[in-house]
From Swiss-Prot:
Organism name: Legionella pneumophila (strain Paris)
Transferase recorded as keyword: yes
Protein name (database record): Guanylate kinase
Group of enzyme by EC: transferase
GO cellular component term of the entry, any: cytosol
Name of the gene: gmk
Molecular functions per Gene Ontology: ATP binding; guanylate kinase activity
Domain Guanylate kinase-like: 7-185
One Pfam family matching this protein: Guanylate_kin
EC number per UniProt: 2.7.4.8
Length: 209
């Protein structure tokens, strides 16, 4: 259980190629007091990625060992590679009043919601399947058969949108980024958050009547 003084937890999910990672990076750049939770994965490091920044890259034996130790709040196998979110990473930040955003898939989102029912979830969708395929091809990271597999899986993933609190269409990146930022800012201004954060001001204003 987290108090009203704790940070907020945000879940951002999308089908592969939906642009969630780029949108989350933009969110971190533009909004203060929010950090992305760095997941563990068994997949190979991609060009431009950094250890401990994009992911903690570990082998399958290490990953399974962490699962058995209860180190992950959620974990799932996606395209033959494991991904997991550290319990300690999330809780430590939330307890210090820092907002945390999770860049995960719908399976991970489902598991997170069971443990953190107050988490705010956002699903990112492409404007069309053709656009999604074009983005996957432009990444130049996967072979044609892998792209076909990702497209097939994407159609299944898109069917999970009703499980989320918010839906953003990533057609215009800047517009989508602003919409994601707006969700975070609006959630911070909810009464149950502000009543403690602004307790002194509210007390002063009311006592002055």
């Amino acid at each position: 259980m987290v108090s009203d003084n704790s940070g907020n937890l945000y879940i951002v999910a999308a089908p592969s190629g939906g642009g969630k990672t780029s949108l989350v990076k933009k969110l971190i750049e533009m909004v203060g007091e929010i950090e992305v939770s760095v997941s563990h994965t068994t997949r190979p490091m991609r060009p431009g990625e950094k250890e401990g920044v994009d992911y903690f890259f570990i082998d399958e034996e290490q990953f399974i060992s962490m699962v058995n130790e209860g180190a992950f709040i959620e974990h799932a196998k996606v395209f033959n590679h494991w991904y997991g979110t550290s319990v300690a990473q999330i809780n430590k930040r939330l307890q210090f009043g820092i907002d945390v955003v999770l860049d995960i898939d719908w399976q991970g989102a489902e598991q997170i919601r069971h443990s953190y029912p107050d988490a705010v979830s956002v699903f990112i969708i492409p404007p069309s399947l053709d656009t999604l395929k074009e983005r996957l091809m432009n990444r130049r990271q996967d072979k044609d058969n892998v792209i076909s597999e990702r497209m097939t899986k994407a159609q299944d993933e898109l069917g999970h949108y009703p499980e989320f609190d918010y839906l953003i269409v990533n057609d215009d990146f800047e517009k989508a980024a602003m919409e994601l930022q707006s969700i975070v800012i609006a959630n911070r201004l909810r009464i149950e958050k502000q009543v403690n954060k602004q307790a002194k001001l509210l007390s002063f204003l009311l006592s002055s009547q």
